[in-house]
From Swiss-Prot:
It holds the Pfam family 7tm_4. Odorant receptor. Disulfide bonds join C112-C204. The gene is OR2AK2. Residues 1-40, 95-115, 174-210, 275-287 are extracellular. Residues 65-72, 136-154, 235-251, 308-335 are cytoplasmic. It is a multi-pass membrane protein. Keywords: Cell membrane, Disulfide bond, G-protein coupled receptor, Glycoprotein, Membrane, Olfaction, Receptor, Sensory transduction, Transducer, Transmembrane, Transmembrane helix. InterPro entries: GPCR_Rhodpsn (IPR000276), GPCR_Rhodpsn_7TM (IPR017452), Olfact_rcpt (IPR000725). One of its GO terms (cellular component) is plasma membrane. This is Olfactory receptor 2AK2. Glycans are attached at N20.
Length: 335
């Protein structure tokens, strides 16, 4: 018996001692944290990252909405990405925090189903949005004369609608199928949220055929956009190196590399989770990998896609200057 089994058994016994009568239909989440000062410190770190991610995404959304200079296709797609990230990180971290603070690991069947659906829908939407954003940069740099036509408001709205619809439909199909399966083993989910691979380990019938469906979905929704991103940025770099000076080339390489690092972090970790066979899974490793696409990427996206942009940083400075002036005026009015 390994340490993961011991922890799971302890949580199971603890839940039974609390007299939870709904244990037969509810699930129990092992969680990311156990109890102790090290895990309490880790909880504080995660809570801080969550707060920073919320603040960064909310600020970027409002900044794009309020500043008319940022009402362009690129920033429209970026605002949609921030909305997705805002909802994405809020799907898992608050429940994880409540479970840790209240020492209650229970999640109701319906709550688990809703969390699975929302998480899958937002993950699929983000994967497609990142692909569309790379296409926007490709058109802007490689086909600037055709940019107004290829990235019109109508096309941008169609891209966003396609991303949301595809992510939602994919999530609905998988959630509907998984939660009609017989969970005839322990209701203990060795994860910090309800995720399809973790749920499949509780199913008593053979799920190998369905796992091929998960693999196919992962290749379509995750791998294809990632390949499109790689191709787009490769073409962008080729064009930049043919046309720009050394300074422009260095800036393009720096920008593209930062975008690629964040995108690669998201796609690599999600592909690692959703395209591996069940026999190669490790609950502890799966939880560690999940932290990257549930917490780290929503934290990094607003900063990576905006801090290197002069228009966004300029808008932030103007907004802060306006806020400081207003605060000074309000302070002086008291006297």
């Amino acid at each position: 018996m390994n340490i993961s089994d011991v922890i799971s058994f302890d949580i199971l016994v603890s839940a039974m001692k609390t007299g939870n009568q709904s244990f037969g239909t509810d699930f129990l989440l092992v969680g990311l944290f156990q109890y102790g000062w090290i895990n309490s410190l880790l909880f504080v770190v995660i809570a801080t990252l969550f707060t920073v991610a919320l603040t960064g995404n909310i600020m970027l959304i409002h900044l794009i909405r309020l500043n008319t200079r940022l009402h362009t296709p690129m920033y429209f797609l970026l605002s949609q990405l921030s909305i997705v990230d805002l909802m994405y990180i809020s799907t898992t971290v608050p429940k994880m925090a409540v479970s840790f603070l209240s020492q209650s690991k229970t999640i109701r069947f319906l709550g688990c189903e809703i969390q699975t659906y929302v998480f899958l829908a937002l993950g699929g939407t983000e994967a497609l949005l990142l692909g569309f954003m790379s296409y926007d940069r490709y058109v802007a740099i490689c086909h600037p004369l055709h940019y107004p036509m290829l990235m019109s408001k109508k096309i941008c709205c169609l891209m966003v609608a396609c991303a949301w619809a595809s992510g939602s439909i994919n999530a609905f199909i998988h959630t509907l199928y998984v939660f009609q399966l017989p969970f005839c083993r322990s209701r203990l989910i060795n994860h910090f949220f309800c995720e399809v691979p973790a749920l499949l380990s509780l199913v008593c019938q053979d799920t190998s055929q369905y796992e091929y469906t998960v693999l196919l979905s992962g290749l379509i929704i995750l791998l294809l956009p990632f390949l499109a991103i790689l191709a787009s940025y490769a073409r962008v770099l080729i064009v930049v190196f043919q046309m720009s000076s050394g300074k422009g080339q260095a800036k393009a390489v720096s920008t593209c590399s930062s975008h690629l690092i964040v995108a690669s972090l998201f796609y690599a970790t999600t592909l690692f989770t959703y395209t591996r066979p069940h026999s190669l899974r490790s609950p502890s490793r799966d939880k560690a990998v999940a932290v990257f696409y549930t917490i780290v990427t929503p934290l990094l996206n607003p900063f990576i896609y905006s801090l290197r942009n002069k228009e966004v940083t300029g808008a932030v400075r103007r907004l802060l200057g306006y806020w400081i002036c207003c605060r000074k005026y309000d302070f002086r009015s008291l006297y």
